[in-house]
Structure formats: structure tokens, C-alpha cells
Amino acid sequence: PAPNYTLYYFNGRGRAEILRMLFAAAGQKFNDKXXEFN
């Protein structure tokens, strides 16, 4: 079975976008968790 990945990041300026593209290109499912700046 494939591992279950979770991407944790702060919203802002698309910094996690490259990681999302890499997961998609690899066909890897992942959980996307965004945190807001307070």
C-alpha cells in the first residue's frame, strides 16, 4: 500500500503549489491542509 501524505502549509503566495503539482504528476493522492495567518 502507498503511504498517505499530508501537505501542511500557510496560505499565501502559492508556495505549496509546486508540491501539489509534483504529487499530481506522480499520481499520488494527498491531503491538502492550509492554515491561515492570524
Swiss-Prot record:
All residue ranges annotated as the GST N-terminal domain in the record: 3-38
Alphabetically ordered keywords of this record: Eye lens protein
Keyword Cytoplasm: no
InterPro entries: Glutathione_S-Trfase_N (IPR004045), Thioredoxin-like_sf (IPR036249)
SUPFAM superfamilies membership: Thioredoxin-like
GO molecular function, one term: structural constituent of eye lens
UniProt key word Electron transport: no
Functional summary from the UniProt entry: S-crystallins are structural components of squids and octopi eye lens. Contains relatively little if any GST activity.
Protein name: S-crystallin 3
